């Protein structure tokens, strides 16, 4: 079976969804920009040699509809002979895109693929056009479709206090801002055109979603966002609404070396699981355990983790049940996470994987794990190994 390697991984800056940098930039343009950039950064691979493009996106309607993967590829002037498909596993879409491409390469059906994802939550809101079947309420609690309430449920089940959530959220912003100031994101962010507050067109090379002024004291003043009576989850401890895209060049190790391209990491194992929709945020626990089992590793073997921060109330139970509470500051989301950077749904799987690869190199660790929860009760995880 072919070894699957990540040759390159990049992303756009994360823009605020409400009047942010990309308010006049379409999702297809964000995607096409990264496709062009990946190919330009790796000229040894001709675009025509790509076997497929796998692109994650959740709200596949309006500008994100009608197979945005293909539309973006056409905009990027990828040869017409290269196919493209849009993947949807909700929050795990672009990580699923990676898994789909990896399996094609493992079986010998492909040698080189572009993978990634996008979500413009400012142009296509998360709730746009959603119409759940009424019959679902016979099998699933109605609140299972409200992500904030599933986070409230996890907080109650696992004893996650408001104070713990506020502290974790403040940490996310502090870590992300420190990473920005130190240049830790420079290797992953591709400058991207957008508009500043005055409408001036400029190139953005930083995440505008981060709020460096965030403090635990300020977060403590916010009202509960989903359960106004007894809730603990606030807007400040939830992932920010943002617009962005991320992309990776995935190849067989043999083809990469044949072309003189240096692999950055191998895909060691992959896993996806289902869980109770009412605690959808718990999905990373069984997904990570399964991925580790497939890799023949334990959590202690992993040097750094990237765990998507849908909510502080959601990620803390996952950290706890993976036995990592004492290692948060050494191993978990060292450059902040979605609470600070935002969670553009279809983009996030590739985004956290991209950040993870850079952290693995910076920390000089052999193994890294990226994982995320998925709305309606799923979890997805990938173990990477440095080459």
From Swiss-Prot:
The active site is at 91 (acyl-thioester intermediate), 343 (proton acceptor), 373 (proton acceptor). It catalyses: an acyl-CoA + acetyl-CoA = a 3-oxoacyl-CoA + CoA. It is found in: Cytoplasm. Pfam families: Thiolase_C, Thiolase_N. Pathway: Lipid metabolism; fatty acid beta-oxidation. GO terms for biological process: fatty acid beta-oxidation; phenylacetate catabolic process. InterPro entries: FadA, Thiolase, Thiolase-like, Thiolase-like_sf_Thiolase, Thiolase_acyl_enz_int_AS, Thiolase_AS, Thiolase_C, Thiolase_CS. One of its GO terms (cellular component) is cytoplasm. One of its GO terms (molecular function) is acetyl-CoA C-acyltransferase activity. It is an enzyme of class 2 (transferase). Coiled coil: none annotated. Keywords: Acyltransferase, Cytoplasm, Fatty acid metabolism, Lipid degradation, Lipid metabolism, Transferase. Its EC number is 2.3.1.16. Heterotetramer of two alpha chains (FadB) and two beta chains (FadA). Belongs to the thiolase-like superfamily. Thiolase family. Catalyzes the final step of fatty acid oxidation in which acetyl-CoA is released and the CoA ester of a fatty acid two carbons shorter is formed. This is 3-ketoacyl-CoA thiolase. It comes from Escherichia coli O1:K1 / APEC. The lineage of its organism: Bacteria, Pseudomonadati, Pseudomonadota, Gammaproteobacteria, Enterobacterales.
């Amino acid at each position: 079976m072919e070894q699957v390697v990540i040759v390159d991984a990049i992303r756009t800056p994360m823009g605020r969804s409400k009047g942010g940098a990309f308010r006049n930039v379409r999702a297809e343009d964000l995607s096409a920009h990264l496709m062009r950039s990946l190919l330009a950064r790796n000229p040894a691979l001709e675009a025509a040699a790509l076997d497929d493009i796998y692109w994650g996106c959740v709200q596949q309607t309006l500008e994100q509809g009608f197979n945005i993967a293909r539309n973006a590829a056409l905009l990027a002037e990828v040869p017409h002979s290269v196919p493209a498909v849009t993947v949807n596993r909700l929050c795990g879409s672009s990580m699923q895109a990676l898994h789909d491409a990896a399996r094609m390469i493992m079986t010998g059906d492909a040698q080189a693929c572009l993978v990634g994802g996008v979500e413009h939550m400012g142009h296509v809101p998360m709730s746009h056009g959603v119409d759940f079947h009424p019959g679902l309420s016979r099998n699933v609690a109605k609140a299972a479709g409200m992500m904030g309430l599933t986070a409230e449920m996890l907080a109650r089940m696992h004893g996650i206090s408001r104070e713990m959530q506020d502290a974790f959220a403040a940490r996310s912003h502090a870590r992300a801002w420190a990473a920005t100031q130190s240049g830790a994101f420079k290797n992953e962010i591709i400058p991207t055109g957008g508009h500043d507050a005055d409408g001036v067109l400029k190139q953005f090379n930083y995440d505008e979603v981060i709020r460096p002024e965030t403090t635990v004291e300020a977060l403590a003043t916010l009202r509960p966002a989903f359960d106004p009576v007894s809730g603990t989850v606030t807007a400040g401890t939830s992932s920010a609404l943002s617009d962005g895209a991320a992309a990776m060049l995935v190849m067989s190790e043999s083809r990469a070396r044949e072309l003189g391209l240096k692999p950055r990491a191998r895909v060691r194992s992959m896993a996806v699981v289902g869980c109770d929709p009412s605690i959808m945020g718990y999905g990373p626990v069984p997904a990570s355990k399964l991925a580790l089992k497939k890799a023949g590793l334990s959590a202690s073997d992993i040097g750094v983790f990237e765990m998507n921060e849908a909510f502080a109330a959601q990620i803390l139970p996952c950290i706890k049940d993976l036995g990592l509470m004492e290692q948060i500051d050494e191993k978990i989301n060292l450059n902040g996470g979605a609470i600070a950077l935002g969670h553009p749904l279809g983009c996030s799987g590739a985004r956290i994987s991209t950040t993870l690869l850079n952290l693995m190199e910076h920390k000089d660790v052999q193994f890294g794990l990226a994982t995320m929860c998925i709305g309606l009760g799923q979890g997805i995880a990938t173990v990477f190994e440095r080459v």
